């Protein structure tokens, strides 16, 4: 019997034999954890009027919407590894790569799903939750489910034909080096033609199954979109008029921005790409991103509707977040991988039954999610592991604060983000080789690097001191 077959066999036995035990724990809150790849706070509930996201917005009306939530590193694998272990990234030791593996980088850490599993929960992973399907696979009650085993291991040409591009004309735009198809596609197909429609249907099926089991559950649902390529069914493209989509008002590089601030070049590896300076490209790309967000919103709506229909909504905490941000032309960038606000700030929406909710301005970061869910569900946290802080006080009162700043890292750069300032330094050894400071009170778009400002000299000095202190704390062996 193969290892995967063995895992499934054990999972089935566990499913049957645990029903009686789980059934005695009806007082426990469930968790529906929804994570979307590359989704920035470009949602109606974040004040974006152009985008169509009625289902997320509906949940947000009953939830706490965090206005200043930050990932701890702006790349998928590392961000998720940090989030699901409650441990900060640390160069070069752990959680630094796009395909970071939490088990390898931090083998002693107990993952969030495993923590719940050890405390009587049935835990399921659908879609892209951890970046790698094998990462912490045994943390789950069942082997992690994806539409395909692991797309990154497939030949790109086969991958293109099989999953991503449905229009025949798309085959004319295959990139000669990467063999990827065009960066976007509008195909007149059903929602389940693309991966995320299937992820939603699997999650709905699991909700029904879990309802029958009468178990406390942690159900994770990971959507691939709005990650590139911006492929979504045509009906979601049709929600928008391309010529009316507002383009970034600051498509230029700020003066005195450190050379270390660049962006991921992934969009250049897709067919049909021309240049980011071309307005036609900008409009098509932003249109595609919006269509993908609306597509994901519709899938989330289906899942939330089923949660309600099954009578589980009042016993289930719902979390919706993006794994980091993404530039849509701001400062000329189309991607992530930097310490600017558009790459590091992410949507975080948490609905807790019987909590009032509201818009929360206090700073939180992804390492805070693990201890928060444990506190809400009365699950003991692993001793000596978690580096974040529970934001339950904010869920109870959206005016409260739990910390002064978030700490974000990227390739030798270290960033502190408070409600007012964003300050970053780049180090080579102990020497500072790059600096940036933005006063978010007067410059929310981050268009002017204030690093040379005389009036802010004391604040800048203090922020740099805090960065160095935090960096030293994290360099201690875990």
Where are these regions (language model features)?
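Formylglycine-dependent sulfatase
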Residues: 2, 6, 21-435, 444-475
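Bacterial N-terminal signal peptides
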Residues: 8-17
């Amino acid at each position: 019997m193969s290892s995967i077959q063995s895992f499934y066999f054990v999972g089935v036995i566990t499913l049957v034999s645990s029903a009686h035990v789980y059934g005695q724990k009806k007082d426990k809150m469930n968790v529906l954890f929804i994570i979307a790849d590359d989704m920035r706070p470009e949602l109606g509930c974040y004040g974006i009027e152009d985008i169509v996201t009625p289902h997320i917005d509906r949940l947000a009306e009953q939830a706490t919407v965090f206005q200043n939530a930050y990932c701890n590193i702006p790349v998928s694998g590392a961000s998720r590894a940090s989030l699901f272990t409650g441990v900060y990234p640390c160069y070069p030791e752990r959680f630094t790569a796009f395909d970071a593996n939490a088990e390898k980088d931090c083998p002693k850490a107990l993952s969030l799903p495993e923590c719940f599993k050890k405390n009587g929960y049935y835990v399921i992973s659908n879609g892209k939750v951890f970046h790698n399907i094998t990462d912490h696979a045994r943390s789950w009650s069942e082997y992690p489910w994806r539409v395909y085993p692991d797309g990154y291991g497939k030949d790109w040409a086969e991958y293109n034909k099989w999953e991503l591009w449905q229009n025949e004309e798309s085959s004319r735009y295959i990139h000669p080096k990467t063999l990827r198809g065009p960066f976007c596609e509008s195909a007149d197909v059903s929602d389940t033609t693309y991966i995320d429609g299937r992820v939603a249907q699997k999650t709905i099926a699991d909700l029904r199954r879990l309802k029958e089991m009468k178990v406390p559950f942690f159900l994770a649902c990971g959507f691939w979109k709005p990650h590139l390529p911006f492929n979504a069914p045509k009906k979601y493209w049709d929600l928008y008029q391309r010529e009316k989509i507002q383009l970034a008002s600051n498509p230029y590089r700020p003066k005195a921005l450190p050379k270390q601030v660049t962006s991921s070049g992934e969009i250049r590896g897709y067919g049909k790409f021309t240049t980011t300076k071309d307005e036609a490209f900008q409009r098509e790309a932003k249109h595609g991103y919006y269509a993908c967000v609306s597509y994901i919103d519709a899938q989330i709506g289906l899942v939330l509707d089923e949660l309600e229909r099954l009578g589980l909504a009042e016993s289930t905490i719902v979390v919706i977040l993006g794994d980091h941000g993404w530039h849509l032309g701001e400062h000329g960038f189309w991607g992530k991988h930097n310490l600017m606000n558009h790459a590091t700030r992410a949507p975080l929406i948490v609905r807790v039954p019987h909590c009032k909710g509201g818009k929360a301005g206090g700073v939180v970061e992804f390492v805070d999610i693990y201890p928060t869910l444990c506190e809400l569900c009365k699950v003991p946290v692993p001793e000596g592991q978690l580096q974040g802080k529970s934001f339950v006080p904010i869920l109870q009162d959206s005016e409260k604060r739990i910390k002064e700043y978030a700490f974000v890292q990227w390739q030798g750069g270290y960033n502190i983000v408070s409600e007012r300032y964003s300050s970053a330094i780049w180090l080579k050894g102990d020497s500072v080789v790059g600096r940036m400071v933005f006063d978010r009170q007067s410059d929310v778009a981050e268009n002017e690097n204030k690093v040379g400002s005389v009036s802010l000299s004391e604040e800048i000095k203090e922020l740099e001191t805090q960065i160095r202190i935090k960096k030293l704390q994290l360099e201690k062996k875990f």
